[in-house]
């Protein structure tokens, strides 16, 4: 039996679930799609002759971004022991959200550019060397910018139900 004095967990809070599902994920999807399109010239796929292949890659990456962004937010909420939205430590949630997203992206970029050679950067991609591995700066910046902005927009557009 749950202690009535204990704070409500975020996963039991309808407002928190609505914020995640109806606000955060749509904002994250829209912003991720925009980022993926804008950073296309930074990858060699930009020169691929088949526009359908490029469109599929953008869609595939956007769906992946949304899943990573959702997992990162859930990890942040669990790590910070978040309660209802009003109880969230937004700074801590955002820091963990960024850390998980950047960490996974660094691993994914390394795996896909070095180990699997699934994709390559164009000469336009700014890179950063971390522990001897050259990583694209754009995908790392994406996780510093996009999920926090999506969460901020979600919170900003979230309206509490009026008490009658």
Residue ranges and their predicted role:
Residues 1-164:
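Aromatic-rich, lipid-facing transmembrane alpha helices and their immediate juxtamembrane interface loops
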